[in-house]
């Protein structure tokens, strides 16, 4: 049983002895305080999105178009938030989505390791970005028994792709998440206005620097790392590449960026084990549809296969709504990044426990004892359109 709601009781009792949490309880304050703790360029990179950031913004506000219907006399105690994913039982449906500059977001510039420690402490899985400050093999042991997954931006060089995936398998990652929507960077005015692109400056490339195939490509010349990375990054994959991707690993294969039902069906028919519905948090393409609006159709097309979701999740209420719309697991990005920036491991743990406490309390108050009780029938559209 969850017990996540107990986090709020602890906060109240701590206050009786004059101890107040140093970390914010709401997202807006968290973001504002994290901005003060981060360099302007790093905050801009994390906070920014594509174009005028309209899609990024509506990813967030779209959740307010759905409302959860309270059910009374249910006796929602205890509550069960466990979820089965790839043969593992997880204490909650929350996970930390991949963030390519997470390594830079702690004061010691070892944010990937810090995130793995958060994973161990909370039981919330981390999807580790390929873009790390520390090599993947040095990161995953810090996650302890919590399953972590490895995210791949598929390089043009197939031998390099195979090497990266094999390393992830050997290191102990439990699944491979292939991001499909970032074979070319989106138009991001915040970053363009300052020429801010961390990889071009040689940051977060530890997994390339430590790869034997990549070392062969640069012939051991470290001065070639950035240009070689630029030349091999970004493989415009097609459906014809899916059998090859499937052949790279026996681990669960999760395809990230799927927003159309037909794409979900083709992905699963082609050997994917799960769908990851996401529009990259609005960072890649402007002028789109809020990711949460795609979720019901993708879930229906997945026909029982796991569907992971992220984009715009800022609260426990958002988590509950995504679960009711059919997500198997729900990812957060900027919230835990800001927690790390503000307080390292402790800051991110606070963010995660706060989200889970709010979600647990909503299930209690509104009468939903388990995740199985949450469905699209538990929601109404507040904007007058049909669900």
Segments predicted by a language model, with ranges:
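Short, conserved beta-strand segments within well-ordered enzyme catalytic domains
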Residues: 67, 73, 82-84, 93-97, ...
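Glycine- and other small-residue-rich loops at beta-strand/loop junctions that grip anionic moieties
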Residues: 48, 104-105, 128-131, 150-153, ...
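An N-cap/entry alpha-helix motif that binds or orients negatively charged groups
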Residues: 1-87, 195-237, 372-374, 380-387
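A gly/proline- and charged-residue-enriched helix-loop-helix capping module
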Residues: 111, 121-142, 146-161
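Glycine-rich active-site/cofactor-binding loop and its immediate structural neighborhood
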Residues: 90-134
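Alpha/beta enzyme core
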Residues: 116-117, 121, 142, 156-309, ...
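Active-site-adjacent helical/loop segments in soluble small-molecule enzymes
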Residues: 367
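C-terminal helical cap(s) of enzyme catalytic domains, especially alpha/beta-barrels
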Residues: 59, 291-301, 340-361
């Amino acid at each position: 049983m969850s017990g996540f709601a107990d986090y709020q009781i602890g906060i109240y009792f701590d206050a009786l002895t004059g101890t107040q949490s140093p970390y914010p309880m709401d997202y807006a304050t968290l973001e504002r305080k994290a901005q003060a703790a981060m360099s302007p360029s790093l905050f801009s990179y994390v906070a920014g999105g594509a174009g005028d950031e309209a899609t990024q913004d509506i990813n967030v506000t779209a959740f307010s178009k759905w409302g959860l219907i309270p059910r009374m006399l249910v006796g929602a105690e205890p509550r069960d938030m466990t979820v089965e994913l790839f043969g593992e039982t997880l204490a909650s449906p929350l996970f930390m989505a991949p963030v390519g500059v997470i390594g830079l977001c702690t004061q010691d510039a070892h944010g990937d390791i810090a995130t793995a420690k958060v994973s161990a402490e909370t039981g919330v899985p981390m999807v580790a970005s390929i873009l790390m400050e520390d090599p993947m093999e040095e990161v995953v042991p810090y996650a302890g028994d919590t399953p972590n997954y490895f995210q791949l931006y598929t390089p043009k060089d197939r031998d390099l792709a195979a090497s990266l995936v094999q390393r992830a398998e050997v290191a102990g990652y439990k699944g491979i998440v292939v991001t499909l929507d970032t074979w070319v960077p989106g138009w991001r005015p915040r970053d363009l206005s300052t020429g801010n692109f961390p990889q071009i400056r040689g940051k977060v490339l530890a997994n390339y620097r430590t790869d034997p195939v990549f070392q062969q490509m640069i012939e051991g010349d470290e001065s070639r790392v950035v240009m070689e990375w630029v030349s091999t990054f970004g493989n415009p994959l097609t459906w014809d590449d899916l059998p090859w991707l499937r052949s790279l690993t026996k681990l669960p294969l999760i395809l990230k960026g799927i927003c159309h039902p037909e794409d979900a069906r083709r992905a699963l028919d082609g050997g994917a084990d799960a769908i990851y519905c996401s529009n990259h948090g609005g960072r890649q393409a402007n002028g789109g549809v809020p990711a949460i609006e795609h979720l019901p159709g993708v879930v229906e097309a997945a026909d029982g296969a796991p569907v992971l979701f992220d984009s715009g999740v800022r609260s426990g209420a958002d988590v509950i709504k995504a679960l009711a719309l059919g997500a198997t697991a729900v990812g957060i990005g900027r919230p835990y990044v800001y927690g790390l920036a503000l307080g390292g491991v402790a800051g991110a743990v606070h963010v995660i426990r706060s989200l889970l406490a709010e979600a647990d309390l909503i299930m209690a108050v509104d009468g939903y004892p388990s995740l199985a009780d949450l469905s699209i029938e538990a929601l109404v559209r507040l904007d007058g359109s049909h669900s």
